[in-house]
Design a protein with these regions (language model features):
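Membrane-embedded transmembrane alpha-helical bundles that form the catalytic cores
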Residues: 1-171
Length: 171
């Protein structure tokens, strides 16, 4: 990873185009965070929850979970866009962090498309070596997903979340 970054830094050039493209990406990222994630989706969820008061609790939680996923995507995607935009303004091109995760055909494909920078690092430095050491890819997948869970928060909840994701990939 460092050689690629070093090469990108040596090619770094600030141009009018890079500044304009960077500003566009930065503004789209801020709009994604402020308008979509923090305002529109929250208001929409409040309205949906109010209208679902008589629906089964499971359905209410399922709909709330879908809104939470959208809110995380637009918030995190927005922050990633802000970082990409700031880098572009400085003449640096950095990796995209999302590639249409909603188009994923399965859980493995989802993790190739969601939080690409973390997923690829975990794949290269945990999943690959652990799978090679134990000669069983399932072990690598479980260790990788548990590590990703614990990366988000060192707690029982995220340990379980990582295990759940790992089992979903293995099975």
């Amino acid at each position: 990873r460092f050689p690629k970054f070093k090469r990108e830094m040596s090619r770094r050039r600030v141009t009018t185009d890079s500044v304009l493209l960077g500003l566009e990406r930065l503004l789209l990222g801020l709009a994604s965070i402020v308008i979509v994630a923090n305002w529109a989706l929250r208001r929409a969820l409040e309205m949906v929850q109010a209208s679902m008061a008589s629906e089964p609790v499971f359905f209410q939680h399922w709909v709330s979970g879908c809104f939470e996923w959208l809110q995380i995507f637009f918030s995190f995607g927005g922050y990633s866009a802000v970082a990409i935009g700031l880098a572009k303004i400085a003449g640096i091109t950095i990796e995209e962090n999302f590639n249409a995760p909603w188009r994923a055909s399965d859980l493995v494909d989802f993790w190739r498309r969601w939080h690409i920078t973390l997923s690829s690092w975990v794949r290269d430095y945990l999943h690959g070596p652990v799978s090679a050491h134990f000669r069983w890819p399932a072990t690598g997948a479980l260790v990788a997903m548990i590590a990703m869970g614990l990366w988000h928060d060192f707690s029982w909840y995220y340990l379980g979340w990582g295990l759940w994701q790992g089992l979903g990939i293995v099975l």
